[in-house]
């Protein structure tokens, strides 16, 4: 309907029941007034002023609105609602223009707010289908700047400033609110298209009809000024729901990325990328606007944040997402033996999968073991809705969870599972890790803990943060704590040369800032350090032990032998002597990590480097004098039956808290995935 150079301009002005002017639309208040005037660009003639009052759903006007507009709520009772008012507008414009073949018009407003922040958001909430003419418009402020580059900046420009620049007389205050603005805009437009300016209105602003999904490469350069973070989203919301919340603003292709937590579930946050900084700034004005009954917080974010969530480099994912305008559904809880044919049969003919087998993407670990997740493409919304109705239906003996998904979620899940092990395990031969004389006393408080570090902090940043106390750090005494993904957790432990220096460092450096973040510093001992790494808490109020340090009761059928209990040497090397019941005195010349051993942290997300040890294994050659430790094969087999289908390794290990199990062959899969086997030695250990 809109040509590049329209024949007519329709000047449009809206009024809401709340804030107006520069804050128009920022408070989610409804439209109560529409004013418009038609301008013939060819004849340079201005039509009559038209006005329609609109009845909002909530007939409450703010005091500011009453004072500025002089509109009373009683006068709105008989007014039409927004949908009928828009129909009157469309019909009136069509009759006045007598639109025929080749006749075109375009809306013109004072700034972006009337279209992007008022009409589109409210119409979206009320499920009103806006006419096509509302998807393109001219921003008179921008057009004025193109014609008169020497005028004020766009943000400072308004109708009165433009009128003053052109030398217009100020309108009488007898004009009702909005009428003087519409009259002035008509005069400004006629002046711009006349001598000496002879300006032509072309290339109007566009409003996206719908959100387009797509992929984003990790190598892509993204402007930080186009990204926002939305918080408080309903867990079942999709990228389409986010696009609807920001209706009227143009989101970049594939620019809505839902964030997942450590368990792969949505955490109520999303990162959104807009086409420009202007649209990002308008999005920030929707802070605490509502999605259903929930208010959504909107904050600035960075391009790096967006790439961490939405970026990907997998060719397999790119090929899977190459089909545009597809609806993505995520399957969770699949049997590990599930095939593409079984998935196709699960959905059936009512919701055919796009491309058959090519429309199914199974998620696997780096060694190609299935995770139980898959993504499926559907050609239209109808097929996707039919598919979602199969939520929690059975495939084989397992019920399948179905969720609407996004391209960014596909990237996140694939990135999470396809990453190689981030904490590499040591390989043969057995190597000495730490000479015994350098193991620090566990009760001496010669360590400090740094909490709240920036995730990008390096050892050099920590040394600079400690200042004069950096000279008191022991060799290899800085230990960065990582989370399960191998990324910095914001914590660090540092071994000082003496308890006095550790005390002074904690006193003087506590809550100093590092890269705009304040960092907490606590004095602690090596034993307290281990407590924290196993899930305890350490602050200035003292130390709270982790769950594994709470008193453990012996099994009722077990009695301790009279002699001292002995556990395997390789297992004993992993624990402090004070943690073992009746430990036998062990005097190894060095501490070892046996070949193939796996270290499990049952109660915490940390993967620490042991006190005094290097930050990675394998840098130190094996001593020729060190002999291999013989394997300890005694043990008992326990069969677990009736496990929940979603039970994982962590739940099984927590169930056996207090027992020492053999980590290298601890879990053995069986045919029934709700069962597992655990082997552990006969010794009873409180860990």
UniProtKB/Swiss-Prot annotation:
Q: Which SMART domains match?
A: RRM
GO MF annotation: an example = mRNA binding
List the record's Gene Ontology CC terms alphabetically. Answer: nucleus
Q: Which GO terms describe its biological process?
A: mRNA processing; regulation of RNA splicing; RNA splicing
* CDD domains associated with the record: RRM1_ESRP1, RRM2_ESRP1, RRM3_ESRP1_ESRP2
InterPro entries per UniProt: ESRP, ESRP1_RRM1, Nucleotide-bd_a/b_plait_sf, RBD_domain_sf, RNaseH-like_sf, RNaseH_sf, RRM_dom
Where does the protein principally reside?
nucleus
Q: Does the keyword Membrane apply?
A: no
SUPFAM superfamilies, A to Z: Ribonuclease H-like, RNA-binding domain, RBD
Q: Where in the cell is it found?
A: Nucleus
What function does the entry list? mRNA splicing factor that regulates the formation of epithelial cell-specific isoforms. Specifically regulates the expression of FGFR2-IIIb, an epithelial cell-specific isoform of fgfr2. Acts by directly binding specific sequences in mRNAs. Binds the GU-rich sequence motifs in the ISE/ISS-3, a cis-element regulatory region present in the mRNA of fgfr2.
This one is known as: Epithelial splicing regulatory protein 1
The species this protein was found in: Xenopus tropicalis
């Amino acid at each position: 309907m809109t040509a590049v150079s329209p024949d007519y301009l329709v000047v449009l002005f809206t009024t809401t029941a709340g804030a107006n002017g520069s804050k128009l639309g920022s408070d989610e208040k409804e439209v109560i007034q529409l004013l418009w005037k038609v301008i013939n660009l060819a004849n340079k003639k201005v039509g009559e002023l038209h006005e329609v009052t609109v009845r909002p759903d909530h007939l409450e006007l703010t005091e500011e609105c009453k004072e500025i507009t002089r509109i009373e709520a009683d006068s709105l009772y008989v007014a039409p609602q927004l949908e009928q008012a828009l129909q009157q507008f469309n019909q009136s414009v069509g009759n006045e223009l007598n639109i025929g073949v080749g006749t075109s018009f375009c809306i013109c407003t004072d700034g972006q707010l009337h279209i992007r922040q008022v009409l589109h958001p409210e119409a979206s909430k009320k499920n009103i289908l806006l006419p096509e003419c509302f998807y393109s418009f001219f921003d008179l402020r921008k057009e004025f700047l193109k014609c008169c580059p020497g005028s004020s900046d766009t943000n400072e420009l308004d109708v009165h400033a433009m009128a003053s620049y052109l030398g217009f007389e100020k309108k009488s205050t007898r004009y009702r609110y909005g009428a003087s603005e519409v009259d002035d805009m008509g005069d400004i437009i006629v002046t711009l298209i006349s001598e000496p300016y002879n300006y032509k209105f072309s290339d109007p602003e566009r409003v996206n009809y719908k959100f387009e999904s797509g992929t984003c490469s990790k190598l892509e350069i993204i402007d930080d000024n186009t990204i926002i973070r939305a918080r408080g989203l309903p867990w079942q919301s999709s990228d389409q729901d986010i696009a609807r919340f920001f209706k009227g603003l143009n989101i970049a292709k594939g620019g809505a990325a839902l964030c997942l937590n450590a368990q792969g579930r949505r955490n109520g946050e999303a990162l959104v990328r807009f086409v420009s900084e202007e649209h990002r700034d308008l999005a920030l004005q929707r802070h605490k606007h509502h999605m259903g009954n929930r208010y959504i917080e909107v904050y600035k974010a960075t391009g790096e944040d967006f790439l961490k969530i939405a970026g990907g480099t997998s060719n397999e994912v790119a090929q899977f997402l190459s089909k545009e305008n597809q609806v993505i559904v995520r399957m969770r809880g699949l049997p590990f033996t599930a095939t593409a044919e079984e998935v196709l049969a699960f959905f059936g003919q009512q919701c055919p999968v796009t491309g058959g087998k090519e429309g199914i993407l199974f998620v696997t670990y780096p060694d190609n073991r299935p995770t139980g997740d898959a993504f499926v493409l559907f050609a239209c919304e109808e097929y996707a809705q039919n598919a979602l109705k199969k939520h929690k239906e059975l495939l084989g003996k397992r019920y399948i969870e179905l969720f609407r998904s996004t391209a960014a979620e596909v990237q996140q899940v694939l990135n999470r599972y396809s990453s190689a092990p981030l904490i590499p395990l040591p390989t043969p031969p057995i190597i000495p890790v730490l000479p015994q004389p350098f193991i620090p006393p566990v009760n001496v408080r010669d360590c400090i803990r740094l909490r709240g570090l920036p995730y990008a902090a390096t050892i050099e940043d920590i040394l600079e943060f400690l200042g004069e106390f950096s000279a008191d750090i022991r060799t290899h005494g800085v230990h960065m704590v990582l989370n399960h993904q191998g990324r910095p957790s914001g914590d660090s432990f540092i071994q000082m040369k003496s308890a006095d220096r550790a005390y002074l460092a904690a006193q003087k450096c506590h809550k100093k800032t590092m890269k705009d973040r304040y960092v907490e510093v606590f004095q602690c001992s090596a034993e307290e350090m281990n407590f924290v790494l196993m899930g305890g808490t350490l602050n200035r109020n003292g130390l709270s032990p982790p769950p594994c340090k709470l008193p453990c009761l012996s099994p009722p059928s077990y009695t301790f032998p009279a002699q001292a209990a002995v556990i395997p040497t390789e297992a004993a090397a992993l624990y402090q002597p004070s943690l073992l019941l009746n430990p036998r005195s062990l005097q190894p010349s060095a501490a070892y990590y046996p070949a193939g051993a796996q270290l499990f942290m049952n109660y915490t997300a940390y993967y620490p480097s042991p006190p005094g040890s290097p930050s990675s294994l394998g840098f130190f050659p094996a001593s020729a004098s060190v002999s291999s430790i013989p394997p300890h094969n005694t043990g008992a087999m326990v069969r677990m039956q009736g496990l929940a289908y979603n039970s994982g390794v962590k739940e099984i290990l927590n169930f056996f808290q207090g027992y020492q199990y053999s980590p290298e062959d601890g879990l053995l899969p069986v045919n029934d995935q709700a069962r597992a086997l655990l082997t552990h030695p006969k010794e009873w250990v409180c860990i």
